[in-house]
């Protein structure tokens, strides 16, 4: 049962900034890119990187996510020895142990890690869009003889205060770390991807659990303490597309990025496929009167109107004389006739009646997350 590396995937986030999209599901279960869920990218990275043992830590609204993951067969992670294991909070004698932070969620599942006695633990977040070979990061970690390796990316200075920010020497050794600083001194951001030497991780998680002043978070507590105690932390520089889709705006932007001819995120690469659960829908139907351009249209869609620069998930119907522009239409949405949709995200299963106009009244560039209340208001 011993494994060289076990991945722990944090997938319990509420995603409150995504508003109505996460009302009934955790953020990693939100649809993305015409046929995927956000978590597909991290799970596919694991599969493509040869990581065959993944613990998925869930908490907020887990039903949709649990049903989607199943036994992990979509990502070739339905293994007898290892594979995918969903790890929800659990009751221990007198109380339920809810996860209090990112570090707490790993600590509460030390028994899961103990059974594999790995050399390394890879800690991942299930709510980012990117392609990455974790095997190369592990090789880097071993080469640097690091205690901890953090994957890092340069972000815009205007965004830096949203991330864990660090400074590193030319050889990659991390010298300074601030979690979401108000006035960042660097734009080198943590991607929330860590490789720990297992004995060290276990030791510091046990120490952290005994600290009544800790918030039990990797960025706020564990990483600063490791630096303070002179452990060797290395920064692994990531080059490529990476998007934190934690807001309605950023989720829309990431979907629109897929439609660029020179997009950094290439879904059609054979060498690094992104796997998902097949929706088992019939082929899409595009009528002779329809016009579709620069768009992703998934299985089961029926299009009679005009669709431009948009992403349509499975089971979407677009009525006659309807125009959909620069929008993301989630699964099983029905759009009536003579409807106008611009710069919007339409959530799962919504029905838009004939004549509805869906666009922002304030700003032509603002992305609108459509709600039932908005549709009712438009029809008054």
From Swiss-Prot:
Keywords: ATP-binding, Carbohydrate metabolism, Glycogen biosynthesis, Glycogen metabolism, Nucleotide-binding, Nucleotidyltransferase, Transferase. SUPFAM superfamilies: Nucleotide-diphospho-sugar transferases, Trimeric LpxA-like enzymes. Pfam families: Hexapep_GlmU, NTP_transferase. It comes from Bacillus subtilis (strain 168). Induction: Expressed exclusively on media containing carbon sources that allow efficient sporulation. It catalyses: alpha-D-glucose 1-phosphate + ATP + H(+) = ADP-alpha-D-glucose + diphosphate. It is an enzyme of class 2 (transferase). One of its GO terms (biological process) is glycogen biosynthetic process. This is Glucose-1-phosphate adenylyltransferase. InterPro entries: ADP-Glc_PPase, ADP_Glu_pyroP_CS, GlgC_bac, GlmU/GlgC-like_hexapep, NTP_transferase_dom, Nucleotide-diphossugar_trans, Trimer_LpxA-like_sf. Pathway: Glycan biosynthesis; glycogen biosynthesis. PROSITE patterns: ADP_GLC_PYROPHOSPH_1, ADP_GLC_PYROPHOSPH_2, ADP_GLC_PYROPHOSPH_3. HAMAP family: GlgC. GO terms for molecular function: ATP binding; glucose-1-phosphate adenylyltransferase activity. It comes from the Bacteria. The keyword Nucleotidyltransferase applies. Its EC number is 2.7.7.27. Involved in the biosynthesis of ADP-glucose, a building block required for the elongation reactions to produce glycogen. Catalyzes the reaction between ATP and alpha-D-glucose 1-phosphate (G1P) to produce pyrophosphate and ADP-Glc. Belongs to the bacterial/plant glucose-1-phosphate adenylyltransferase family.
